[in-house]
Amino acid sequence: MAIGNVSVVLVHGAWADGSSWSKVIERLEGQGIRAVAAPLPLTSLQDDVAALNRTLERIDGPVVLAGHAYAGAVIGSAHAENIKALVYVTALAPDEGETVGEVFYRAEPHPQAPRLAPDQHGLIWLPDEAFPAAFAQHAASQELAVLRAVQRPIAVACIGEPVGRPLWKDVPSWFLLAEDDRMIVPATQRYMAERMKATIKPHAVDHTPSVTAPTVVADIIRDAIRSVSYN
């Protein structure tokens, strides 16, 4: 199987949209790798998995799935037969019966992590000041302005629904461990990555490396593609 025959599906997390992957897409496409960003409604975990499955239905051939943050739970809940590997970009990986909230809050939060609470509509928004403080502290001011402008809230239902048997038990996985992450502390990332038996790639990046360190992200995705292409 040639590298160019593998498609990459990129899945955004909370407070973001598909544009957060734009720099990664540029790097993958520049290497002849087709990449598609899957849009999520962020209304419930079930809704998000259904949306991802609709994107996967449109793709022929083998797929490497990459998810950022909350989207780790989404890619782990997909079960399309053409998924050959998973890439967790400082992402949450609940095990069977666990919720996103349980793994997110399993450790003491970083001192600069924002306090999160739903509004009257059951939606959780990221405060503006949290973008430079914790979400993407390595980003340039122009990048932060865009991240704030396009943020999409996540519904409480997304983080309270237990997951089924995760796909990472059945296909190989890679984990970008963000050592400077202030949203999902590194200890929590390592706990999840080790129990997944993932190939762990630690880097001194923040919570949103798709924006602030896209080459690092693209290189790890390419490693996953190469592994499934030659095995």
Language model features with spans:
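Gly/Ala-rich beta-loop-alpha elbow adjacent to hydrolase catalytic centers
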Residues: 66-75
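Active-site nucleophile elbow and catalytic-triad environment of alpha/beta-hydrolase enzymes
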Residues: 146-167
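Conserved loop-alpha-helix segment in the C-terminal half of the alpha/beta-hydrolase fold
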Residues: 179-204, 208-211, 216, 223-224
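Short, proline-enriched alpha-helix->beta-strand connector loops that line the catalytic pocket
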Residues: 6, 168-173, 196-198
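Glycine-rich phosphate-binding loop signature in dinucleotide/nucleotide-binding domains
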Residues: 3, 58-61, 169, 224-230
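Active-site catalytic motif of lipid deacylating hydrolases and related acyltransferases
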Residues: 4-61
